[in-house]
């Protein structure tokens, strides 16, 4: 028997957009306060930026004593292996945290919100997703963060480059740079983390900073 796609979510007190740290914390505390709430997230699981970013060397730049939930049941049940965990370990942490707090039952993944409007007549928010889901709520918490969109500069003559152009957000799984000439443009956190990892491989590596400022 065919499964009918969900097109209308039962009305909630609150819809939370985003399943990273902010969204997970919002859902947990809203439910604890007695509100009905659901998370909508464009990705396939919890984690936010740590679910999206899987490039070589991706890791936290804040130490774990401060970069985690303070809830005892979450904190005491997970031991980080490093002070600055990798993105892979952060995904394992989010799996642990979401299981401990029972968040998955109120989360809908693969639901990219494309419209949020307030209906004055019903005094409700109406959210629509790319897949056609419609959700209504009294309140909305926007917790999508600021790093969910890839910035790809329109460099002059970029189309003339015949090799692959890879943004860290879309790094291919198991990509092998051995024996290749690799140029890294940008020396922020992502750029430097990738450089540190690729420097361990047998490739010709060049790092450029278009801004001319020192690495950050």
What do these predicted ranges mean?
Residues 3-11, 15, 19-39, 43-45, ...:
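Rossmann-like dinucleotide-binding core of oxidoreductases
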Residues 35, 51-93, 212-216:
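Glycine-rich active-site loop/strand segments that organize a redox cofactor
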Residues 46, 55, 113, 171:
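Hydrophobic pocket-lining residues within nucleotide cofactor-binding pockets
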Residues 52, 76, 81, 102, ...:
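A short alpha-helix-loop-beta-strand transition element characteristic
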């Amino acid at each position: 028997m065919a499964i009918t796609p969900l097109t209308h979510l039962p009305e909630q007190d609150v819809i939370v957009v985003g399943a990273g740290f902010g969204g997970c914390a919002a859902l947990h505390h809203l439910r604890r306060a007695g509100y009905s709430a659901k998370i909508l997230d464009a990705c396939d699981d919890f984690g936010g930026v740590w679910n999206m970013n899987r490039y070589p060397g991706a890791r936290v730049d804040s130490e774990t004593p401060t970069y985690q939930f303070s809830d005892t049941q979450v904190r005491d049940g997970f031991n980080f292996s490093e002070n600055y965990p990798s993105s892979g370990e952060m995904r394992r942490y989010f799996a642990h945290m979401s299981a401990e707090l029972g968040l998955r039952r109120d989360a809908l993944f693969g639901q990219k919100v494309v419209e949020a409007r307030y209906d004055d007549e019903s005094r409700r928010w109406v959210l629509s997703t790319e897949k056609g889901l419609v959700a209504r709520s009294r309140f909305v918490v926007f917790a999508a963060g600021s790093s969910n969109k890839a910035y790809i500069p329109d460099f002059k003559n970029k189309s003339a480059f015949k090799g692959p152009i890879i943004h860290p957000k879309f790094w291919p799984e198991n990509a092998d740079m051995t024996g290749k000439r690799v140029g890294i443009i940008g020396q922020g956190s992502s750029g430097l983390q990738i450089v540190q990892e690729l420097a361990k491989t047998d490739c010709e590596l060049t790092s450029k900073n278009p801004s001319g400022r020192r690495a950050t």
